Structure formats: structure tokens, C-alpha cells
């Protein structure tokens, strides 16, 4: 064991990725659906590894540059994720959700600061308690930034000791922070004597939102593709264009003649024995049996690739129209609408869902039909899995430049710093990209790498560097005080947010369940709320608050450290 510990001490890269791998593995374990998750596990595993190393006389310490770089990548990734929703929160339809998402973090910050001062907790406790009680692991980074930026008077304590206290406070408060908000979002309607399930059903009927129990994948397909052998004398000798004119409800997608595939050319003259592949709505395919001839199981003729595209809604003729008005259009049986996004936020697809300018439609269907849909709705963009590294690089540079800006205030110079600058630049880039769709493409998988690897790696380094000093600061009295403050900071804000949303803003209780979860920037409670009411309605109240509170809680780790001392 001694040799292995020394090996890790002399090979920091192996140490780092061993910690990350173990954290992801440990984070997968759960008891009745509750677990640490990879990020919380990273700080636990990091501290444990460092403690084991110290027991064998090896003090692990990883490079500060690597730690900062990982955190900066994470912050930019957060900006990319929340940007469209954050900007969308500024419109009048979302303002109530945004207000709730501002109230909750401010209350949590105030309770943490006052609790730290009341109990006289040591440096670092405030930042860790905020991160743990609000289940916002990113706040650990901004709390660390307060130490590295030199805005705190450290006294006799070392940066490593403060980092250890941040990690300790985070670990003590995280469990209730996670479980508590789930229980509150799930049971607050019952405490208030409200039937949230009935409220969800009422909202579904009024807005055409599909129920969560509706099958997401069924054997029924409204669009069908079939092959017919041309034997009907009325069709022999007619061109494909003439056939389309007579039967506009069908899409000719292929013509097979002997060993040749002629495609769907309008000038092609149909001959006896040709095999024609037709696409259309299922009811239409069975309405005119024999129009060409008998149906045949010709796999070669039916081997038609489907197309996928993202369509940016720009045409005035379609904006303001609910989806139900397109049910009778020629495209209704030829393309399938997978999802709709507005400012980067997915919308439930219902009959009353109204299209707005700059909405993005994700469609699948036959290539000609997809192209036609692009002409009808606006501008088409093909799906791409490539990341625009040029925009990513300049977005990072913009963030660092914003971080350099400082303004005089209260006798000192104040600025966003690198982390805040990158968060802001990510918001700017993703907001523009979500509207134009033709630059700055960062697929979800690529953005997840920035966020997941960045945050887990950063937190792992914090744990490794702080672990050796952790046990020296842990006492029962301090741990109890930290838990009490964390419990209050986690429990009180959601209750107040619910009361304001229900009594003052008159928000539908099912929506408010999701809004309360969003105000704490935690998707778990929204998921449980959806299960509780048997509807997807709570998710509608979630995205705006999730974006706004996520940004605020991320930077509030810094303010918790500064204001508490």
C-alpha cells in the first residue's frame, strides 16, 4: 500500500483520473433512489484519497492551474446551457418564475451568512454550506475564488485549511439539501390542502399538454410507406407529376423499374410492372386501394432514407398559429415533429402549442417533405454533431476579457472575475446561437463534457488538496452547527417561494411544484413532482427558474464567503 500511495504521489494525472473514475462509480450507487451523485462523490473520494495518503506520510497536491482551468471550462459550459432560458426569463410570460428563482437563492444566502455569524463558524464554512444546502456544487468554485482572489483576511489559517472547511461543510449539508427539496416539492401541495393532480389535469385540458402516462413510443405511426406494382390501366402511361396532381395526398418517393431505381422524378412515365413507393397518412393509404395496382413487399423500393432537420420558424404566415391548424396540411402525414424548442427550452407538444418566431422545430421524415417544411416554416438547418471550436475559443477569450473589467465601488475595485466573465460570455454566445442556429454549434454531448468533466475534476482536486487537513478541523460541535444552518437554508426558502407563488402570484399548483424545484436549480424534485401528479405539467414551471437560480447560486458561493466574515 505504501508503494501504491507513493506511486500516486509521483503521478498526479493518474491520481486525478483515478479519483474522477471512483467518484463516478460511487455516485451511481443509491438507496431508494437517493444517492450522492458524481459531483458530491468526487469531493468525498478526493478527501478520502488524500486522508489515506496522509496516513502513509504522502501529502497529495494537484496543480492550481489545472484546477482553475477545469472550473473555467465548467462555468462556460453552464453559460452555454442556461443562456437561452436565462434570456427568456426576461419576457413577461416568465417573469413570475424568474422572481421566485431570485427570492430563493437570496434567502438561502442570507440564512447561511447569518447562521455563520451567529455560531461563529470558521472561514470556509459559509461557502460550503451554501453549496451543500442549495445542492449547487458549482458554488464551491466561486467560494474557492474568494480565497484565491485575496478578498478575505485569512489570519492564521492557510488556504488548504479553508478549502478543507468548504469541503467539510458541503458534505455535511448536501444530503438534506438533496432529500429535503425533493420531499418539499412533492408534499407542499398536500400541506396546503391542494389537489395538485387535479390542477395538472385542468391545465392539460386547457392547453393540450400530453400526459406523462401517454406512451412515448407506440406501434402506431400516422405516416406510412408502401410499395405498389403498376397494373391499373388508369395509371399506366401517366407521369409522376400527373399522378401527384390527381392524388396530392400522396408522396411518390421512389420508382423501381427492373433493376433500376429511378427515384421520384416528376417527368418519369409510369409503365406496367413498375414498383412505386408511396408515402402518406395511414388513412389515405387505405382509402384508394388499387389506384396503382396490388401492394407488394418490395424491400428495395422501400429502402428510403429518412431525413432529420432543425427548422427555425421565421415566416410570418405560420407564427401565432397553434399546431392543430397544421393537421390537415399536405405535410401532416409526411413528417414527424419530434420536439419544439423556444429560446433553447423544450416545450411540451400539444394541440394548442402556438408557434412563435425563432422557435426551433425538430422534424424527421422523407427528404422532400422535410425540405418543403423548411420552405413553409422558415429556415432549415441540418443536424450536426460537430462542435464549433472557433466560436468556443473566442467565447472563452471574451469571458476572460470580461473578467478583466473592474469598476470602482465602495473604495475598492469590483469585477466579475474570470469565472463570472465566462458564465456571462457563455450566456451571450448560446443565446445568439439558439436564435440563429448557424454558428456556435455545441452539441449537448460536447457541452456535457465541459460541465461534467470540468466540475467533477475541479471538485476532485479540491478534495485531494484539502483532504489532509480535513480531520484536524472536524469536531462534533462544529458539525452540528453546520448541519443546523444548512437545514434551515435548505428548508425555509422553498416554503416561502411556494407561499408567494400560490397566494400572491396565483400560479397553478402543478406548475408551482416545478417552479419551486427550478428556484433551487434541482431537476430531481421536478421529476418527483411529475410522478406525484402523473403529468408533465410541473416541467413547464421548471426551466426558467432553473436557469436563473443556477446562475445566482453559482456566484453566491463567493458572496457567502465575503459577507459572512
Swiss-Prot record:
Main location per the UniProt record? membrane
Which cell locations does it reside in? Answer: Cell membrane
For this UniProt record, give its keywords in alphabetical order, as a comma-separated list.
Cell membrane, Membrane, Repeat, Transmembrane, Transmembrane helix, Transport
Instruction: Tell me which InterPro entries the record gives.
Output: AAE_transporter, RCK_C, RCK_C_sf, YidE_YbjL
Which ranges does the record mark as transmembrane? 4-26, 33-55, 68-90, 97-119, 162-184, 389-411, 415-432, 453-472, 482-504, 539-561
Cite a single GO BP annotation.
potassium ion transport
Q: Which GO terms describe its molecular function?
A: monoatomic cation transmembrane transporter activity
Name one cellular component (GO) term. plasma membrane
Q: Where is the RCK C-terminal domain?
A: 210-295, 296-379
Provide the membrane topology annotation: Multi-pass membrane protein
Q: Does the keyword tRNA-binding apply?
A: no
Say which family it is in: Belongs to the AAE transporter (TC 2.A.81) family.
- Protein name, entry field: Uncharacterized transporter BPP1579
Q: Which organism is it from?
A: Bordetella parapertussis (strain 12822 / ATCC BAA-587 / NCTC 13253)
Taxonomic placement: Bacteria, Pseudomonadati, Pseudomonadota, Betaproteobacteria, Burkholderiales
